[in-house]
Amino acid sequence: MTTHLEIVKNAIFATGAGSVDHYQHCAWQTLGEGQFMPLPGSHAFIGEINQLERVPEYKVEIICTEEQITVAVAALKKAHPYESPSYQAFRVESI
């Protein structure tokens, strides 16, 4: 069974992100608990309007090049089931 986690990761990997030297599909993921409250007008994948939800969620970290970041984020947004998925991008400098 393919989970949303794997669907989203594979969409990002398809952009070329997650490649390091002679390795592909490189990622770090940790399980945690997310919380949110859908407001009127939202189209929540899970949860009820005006009710606080707490759900198990994975935080996934994937490396990509500066040239890949825009397309990788677009792939994440398209594949993710949430209306507004959370993400962050950090520049990593080589030493």
Give the positions of each predicted feature.
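Hydrophobic structural segments
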Residues: 1-95
